Amino acid sequence: EYPVDEFIDVLNEEKEKGRIKIFGGSNWTIERFKEGNEWAQKNNKQEMSILNNNLALAKMINPLWNGCLSSNQEEILDYLQTTKKSHMSLSSQARGYFLDDTITKEIEEKITRSESSWRKPGEHSSGPLSCYDSEENRERKKRARKLAENKGCSANNIAASWTLSQSFPSFALIGPRTINELDTTLPCLDIELNQEEINWLNLI
């Protein structure tokens, strides 16, 4: 693992050359992210502005891949709310965990089959059930479905809106493979969640 000061130095050099304006870290622990920005402050360097981890309503129980980190943790959410640093979430819809159960199971089976040629025996796949299914997340899904009924949308829309509705700048990366997947995701942009709903969905 490279020292954080080396990253900050190189990224500041790129900024000074006019190649970038802001920068951040992907799959960094909050401790490492803080360390980098503290070093930047002490050395009159520009800080990292963006943390790029997984931030989904469902908390990861197994990493999508080795080194993948979740920002749905109280310490990280508090830090982002206090500092107003931006967050760009990968797998922001938890790989389809909040879709109808039948569809989620189909996605799980498809991903498991496609990864079987290179996964080690006994190693979990990166499917939605392998990485997100837990008692707490099933309760989050139940609450998302209940709120979706009240707002006239899908639970998946509620989950995506949860990521976008944080009290800090929060952006969601999505990977639709069909026009229909895109069309059924975009309604999340019209949903507004208040802080009480955000906390309730996340079991806070």
Predicted regions and their residues:
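Beta/alpha (TIM)-barrel catalytic core signal, keyed to glycine-rich beta->alpha loops juxtaposed to Asp/Glu
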Residues: 1-203
